[in-house]
């Protein structure tokens, strides 16, 4: 399979990819990074599946456009600017997964294969093709032929990588750009490193039946770690170590599944460094974002206390055994000598039930602090699927978020997007400028 390691293909598609993989699943993933004609900084998604790559890339692209540039109008972007911001974004993600190892890889076409998806002999013709509004017009390659046509290129410095990413802009734009970037991420991270982080190495990163990306794939792109869970830190279950997230990511993650109580996202993903969150529904990924940096202010002592407390409450019961109270207090640098801990046990568990509730614990050691979050601010939602947008034109939906309305009479709606956001802000209300609320599917 050329230089494209079979291990890589098995990791992405499963070991039985040559026999059991549906052609439709592979075809749904064969698209490039294409900007919307209606929203110059928004990427389009043609079919279900590749949102596992497109949504994280869109989130990092917005981070760069909103906070790393001096654009007076972040929604305006000319052709050359699109090239720069996309390539810089792809390089940013590759830098994250490399962890400053100064070793980077790109999956690219074999130099001797002058296919229609790659550089054309006629530059004018190539330029014209790359500006097409869809990346689906390139030649159809089957699963085997595609993987026989790519190679691995290595780079020993970030500057070399960035230059190569810019030079291959047409590759990212053309039909197999998303897959080539996904392979570049895995090769840069290292196949063995990915295997060591995935909970079940036998489970492929892309579901061979439905084509959805796994949580490990999403986490890899968002944090640089291919762990399978979204909670903070590691947990132990029946002697097995289950890896989670270990630091605040640049871009966050929220999921509708938490509102349905199927999982609980930890504060490292809920409270990223920038106010941008990939939003997960049962089948799709979208992006929610704002320019309000007060939403991601440094972690308050009470937030840190909640996070530490919850690491000792792996089943999310809202309480811990009183036997681990001393460990929690030590982790938070609170006074933890034996007599004081016993006094706190008596105060926090007056009925002698042997448990410490989260609420009384926070009130005792971290009384209510004034919030720095503004009462209202402008928010945006992105959904890359054409059919999920008005008139099938991919564009951001603008709205206003209002915080702090605990009176149920003031609730505006119970849409999926609000239910998802309430896992982070329980009393948020949303007023959208469009006639209908954003779709998460």
From Swiss-Prot:
It is found in: Nucleus. It comes from the Eukaryota. Pfam families: MINDY-3_4_CD. Its EC number is 3.4.19.12. It is an enzyme of class 3 (hydrolase). Coiled coil: none annotated. It catalyses: Thiol-dependent hydrolysis of ester, thioester, amide, peptide and isopeptide bonds formed by the C-terminal Gly of ubiquitin (a 76-residue protein attached to proteins as an intracellular targeting signal). Its main location: nucleus. The keyword DNA repair does not apply. GO terms for biological process: apoptotic process; protein K48-linked deubiquitination; proteolysis. One of its GO terms (molecular function) is K48-linked deubiquitinase activity. One of its GO terms (cellular component) is nucleus. InterPro entries: EF-hand-dom_pair, MINDY-3/4_CD, MINY3/4. The active site is at residues 51, 284. The keyword Hydrolase applies. Keywords: Apoptosis, Hydrolase, Nucleus, Protease, Thiol protease, Ubl conjugation pathway. Hydrolase that can remove 'Lys-48'-linked conjugated ubiquitin from proteins. Belongs to the MINDY deubiquitinase family. FAM188 subfamily. PANTHER family: UBIQUITIN CARBOXYL-TERMINAL HYDROLASE MINDY-3, UBIQUITIN CARBOXYL-TERMINAL HYDROLASE MINDY-4-RELATED. This is Ubiquitin carboxyl-terminal hydrolase MINDY-3. The lineage of its organism: Eukaryota, Metazoa, Chordata, Craniata, Vertebrata. The gene is mindy3.
């Amino acid at each position: 399979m050329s230089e494209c390691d079979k291990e890589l293909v098995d990791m992405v598609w499963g070991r039985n990819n040559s026999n059991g993989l549906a052609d439709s699943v592979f075809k749904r993933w064969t698209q490039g990074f294409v900007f919307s004609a209606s929203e110059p900084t928004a990427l389009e998604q043609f079919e279900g599946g590749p949102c596992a790559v497109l949504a994280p890339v869109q989130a990092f692209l917005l981070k760069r456009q909103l906070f790393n540039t001096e654009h007076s109008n972040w929604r305006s972007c000319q052709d050359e600017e699109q090239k720069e911001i996309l390539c810089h974004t792809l390089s940013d993600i590759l830098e994250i997964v490399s962890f400053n190892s100064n070793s980077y890889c790109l999956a690219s076409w074999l130099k001797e294969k002058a296919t229609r998806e790659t550089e054309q002999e006629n530059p004018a013709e190539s330029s014209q093709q790359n500006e097409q509004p869809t990346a689906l017009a390139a030649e159809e390659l089957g699963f085997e032929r595609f993987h026989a046509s790519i190679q691995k290129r290595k780079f020993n410095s970030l500057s070399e990588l960035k230059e190569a990413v810019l030079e291959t802009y047409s590759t990212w734009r053309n039909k197999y750009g998303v897959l080539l970037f996904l392979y570049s991420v895995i090769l840069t991270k290292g196949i063995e490193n990915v295997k060591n982080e995935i909970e079940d190495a036998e489970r492929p990163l892309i579901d061979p039946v439905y084509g959805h990306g796994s949580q490990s794939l999403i986490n890899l792109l968002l944090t640089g770690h291919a762990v399978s869970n979204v909670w903070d830190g590691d947990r132990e279950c029946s002697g097995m170590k289950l890896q989670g997230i270990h630091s605040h990511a640049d871009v966050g993650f929220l999921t509708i599944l938490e509102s349905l109580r199927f999982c609980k996202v930890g504060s490292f993903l809920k409270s990223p460094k920038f106010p941008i969150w990939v939003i997960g529904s049962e089948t799709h990924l979208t992006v929610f974002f704002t320019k309000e940096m007060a939403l991601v202010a440094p972690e308050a002592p009470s937030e840190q206390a909640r996070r530490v407390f919850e690491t000792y409450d792996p089943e999310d019961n809202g309480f811990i055994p009183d036997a681990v109270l001393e460990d929690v207090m030590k982790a938070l640098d609170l006074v933890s000598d034996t007599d004081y801990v016993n006094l706190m046990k008596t105060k926090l568990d007056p009925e002698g039930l042997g448990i410490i509730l989260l609420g009384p614990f926070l009130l005792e050691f971290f009384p209510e602090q004034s919030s720095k979050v503004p009462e209202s601010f402008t928010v945006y939602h992105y959904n890359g699927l054409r059919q999920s947008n008005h008139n099938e034109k991919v564009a951001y939906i603008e709205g206003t978020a209002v915080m702090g309305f605990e009176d149920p009479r003031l609730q505006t709606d119970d849409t999926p997007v609000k239910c998802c956001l309430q896992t982070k802000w329980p009393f948020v209300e949303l007023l959208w400028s469009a006639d209908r609320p954003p779709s998460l599917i």
